[in-house]
Amino acid sequence: MGGYGSGRSGGWPTVEDSLSLNLPRLFKTGWLKKGAWTSGILRWSIVGTGEEIASIGFEARLGEKDGYVRLHWTSTNRWSGEKRQCENRIELTTRAQPLGGRRWWFVCLHTGKLAERLHLPSGAYTFACRKAYRLAYRSQRETPRDRALSGAFALRRKLGADGGIGDYVTKPKGVH
C-alpha cells in the first residue's frame, strides 16, 4: 500500500493517454504539404511493443495561407461494443511571424483557439486542444515523490539500465 505509482489515479485523462496530432511533425514527415492535396492513414502504436492501437484516415488540402484536414475513423465503445463512424474537418490557418514567414495552426473545433497539437482522449469523438478536454501531462498528476522517482527511472533508462532503482548502472563511455 502506498508504493510507487499508487497515488492519484483516475481523474481527467492525460495528454499521454490520448491520440495526438502534432502539426509540425505532420509537415516534417510530409503528410501535409503547403499548396497540395494529400491523403493517407495515420497510425499510432505502443512505443515498447510496436502494437498498433489506432489508425485514422485523412485527407488534407492546403493553400498558401489556410486549408483543412478531414479525418475519418470508426470508434468502438469499449463497454457496449457499439461502432460509430466519426469524421472531423479541422481548419488550418497561418499567422505571420516577427522575423518573416508564416506558421501553421489548427483551429480547435471546441474552443476556436489556435493550437499546434490536437488530442483525442478515450471516449471522445472530436480532436480538440488540450484546454478543451482539460488534459494535463502525466507528470502534473503525480505526487512530488512519484515525480522524482519517474525522473530517476527516466535518467536510468537513458543510461541503459533496465532494472530497478537499486541496480548498478555502468558509466557511459567518455565519463571520467
Where are these regions (language model features)?
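A generic structural signal for beta-strand entry/edge sites
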Residues: 66-70, 103, 124-126
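N-terminal alpha-helical interaction blocks
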Residues: 1-94
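TOPRIM metal-binding catalytic domain and adjacent DNA-binding surface shared by DnaG-type primases
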Residues: 154-175
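Short Cys/His-rich "knuckle" micro-motifs
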Residues: 115-121, 139-142
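Short, flexible, mixed-charge glycine/proline-rich loop motifs
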Residues: 89-102, 117-123
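Short metal-binding segments enriched for Cys and/or His
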Residues: 133-149
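Cysteine-rich micro-motifs
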Residues: 107-111, 122-135
